[in-house]
């Protein structure tokens, strides 16, 4: 008999009786149109695309079964929130300081115990409205355990509240179980086929879908704070000099201007595209070019000051260390100035770099685990894309 965790019965009781009561209230609050599905067999790995911070609630409203969420450690930074989540849901926490093997093995052990696991396959909310990179190890996990696989797709979530947005737009969100691949089906599939099915089922391009649906997502200030995602000027090619107000975006270094409409599309006489995914492809190339063209390794390529720099300790608690920190990108390194000291590390030596919330950069080195938040909108992706490029990877 498989041994279950001590509080498994309590948590399962909460989910069985409380979730169905709260789900209709949640759906009305977020404009979510659910399509309830009761799994035909267990255990399973439930994977979803990630469009919004409310996605776990959307998944829970659609799939009537108990499962353990995989959560990033930034969600659990507050001890109060961490204890509440552990009481009602027992999430599997993916700590940034750990290697990917740790969370993989935790999911593996959980599934082998017969307990379902839910995972946001992209690992973070989409920046662009298009489904991003999905790790192949998710397919490896399914094949190693021999469990079922449920693919759950969310549409409308990104345009309801784009990653940069300060306000939620009025518009519908939909969820659906695309397919439940049973254990028997998984046994007949290769790892490649499982991975291809996962990527296919979860793919969403919010802009291409809305080009057909023409659904309005209305906000008073639809462009406000888009600097969290948009950093490359389509006209002069500078990085980190874009600003927004109301429905407008402009560049400090030239006369570039753009506006965004109620359907989420961007318009300017100086750019060939009208969607964030296309804009993002362009601006990533600006970062690559900036690094390639730099000749002095000590030349600051991009810099942001007035950063809130915190340190995460071994318990997962976060402590503010400096309210006036600085983050810098160089040709082959990244630097954080904080609390009278400098943490500068070669991109190739960075243990892990991540991006959470709207603009928090997570930086793990051999010596420290930092969280760099910002007082004013700025794109964390500048540093993420830059460091990954130093490591030899172009960010998808």
Model-derived regions: residue spans:
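Soluble catalytic domains of membrane acyltransferases
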Residues: 2-196, 212-213, 220, 235-236, ...
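Phosphoinositide-dependent membrane-docking surfaces
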Residues: 46, 327-360
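Short hydrophobic/aromatic-rich beta-strand segments that constitute the beta-sheet cores
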Residues: 69, 260, 334-338, 363
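A broadly conserved sequence feature marking short terminus-proximal activation segments
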Residues: 172-232, 237-239, 369-386
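Cys/His-rich short segments
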Residues: 218-271
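Short, surface-exposed charged micro-motifs
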Residues: 241, 257, 324-326, 352
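Anionic N-terminal interaction surfaces
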Residues: 268-326
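Acidic, Ser/Thr- and proline-rich intrinsically disordered linker/docking segments
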Residues: 347-396
């Amino acid at each position: 008999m498989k041994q279950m965790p001590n509080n498994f019965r309590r948590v399962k009781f909460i989910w069985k009786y409380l979730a169905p009561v709260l789900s209709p209230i949640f759906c009305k609050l977020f404009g979510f149109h659910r399509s309830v599905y009761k799994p035909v067999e267990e255990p399973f790995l439930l994977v979803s695309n990630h469009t919004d911070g409310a996605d776990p609630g959307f998944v829970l409203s659609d799939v009537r079964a108990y499962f353990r969420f995989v959560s990033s450690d930034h969600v659990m930074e507050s001890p109060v929130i961490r204890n509440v989540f552990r009481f009602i849901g027992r999430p599997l926490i993916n700590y940034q300081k750990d290697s990917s093997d740790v969370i993989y093995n935790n999911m593996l052990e959980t599934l082998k115990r017969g307990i379902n696991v839910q995972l946001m396959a992209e690992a973070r909310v989409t920046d662009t409205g298009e489904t991003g990179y999905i790790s192949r190890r998710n397919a490896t996990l399914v094949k190693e355990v021999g469990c079922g696989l449920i693919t759950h797709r969310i549409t409308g979530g990104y345009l309801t509240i784009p990653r940069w947005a300060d306000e939620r737009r009025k518009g519908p969100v939909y969820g659906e179980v695309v397919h439940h691949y049973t254990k028997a089906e998984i046994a007949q599939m290769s790892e490649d086929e499982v991975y291809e099915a996962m990527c296919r089922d979860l793919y969403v391009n919010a802009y291409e879908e809305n080009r057909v649906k023409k659904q309005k997502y209305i906000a008073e200030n639809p462009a406000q704070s888009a600097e969290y995602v948009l950093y490359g000027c389509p006209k002069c090619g500078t990085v980190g000099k874009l600003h927004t107000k109301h429905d407008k975006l402009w560049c400090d270094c030239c006369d570039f201007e753009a506006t965004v409409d109620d359907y989420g599309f961007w318009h300017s006489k100086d750019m060939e595209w009208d969607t964030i995914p296309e804009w993002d492809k362009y601006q990533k190339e600006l970062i690559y070019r900036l690094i390639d063209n730099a000749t002095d390794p000590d030349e600051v390529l991009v810099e942001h000051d007035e950063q809130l720099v915190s340190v995460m300790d071994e318990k997962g608690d976060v402590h503010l260390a400096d309210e006036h920190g600085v983050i810098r990108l160089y040709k082959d390194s990244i630097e954080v100035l904080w609390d009278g000291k400098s943490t500068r590390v070669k991109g190739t030596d960075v243990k892990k770099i991540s991006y959470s919330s709207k603009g928090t950069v997570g930086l793990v080195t051999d010596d420290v685990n930092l969280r760099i938040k910002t007082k004013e909108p700025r794109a964390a992706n500048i540093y993420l894309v830059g460091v990954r490029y130093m490591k030899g990877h172009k960010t998808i």
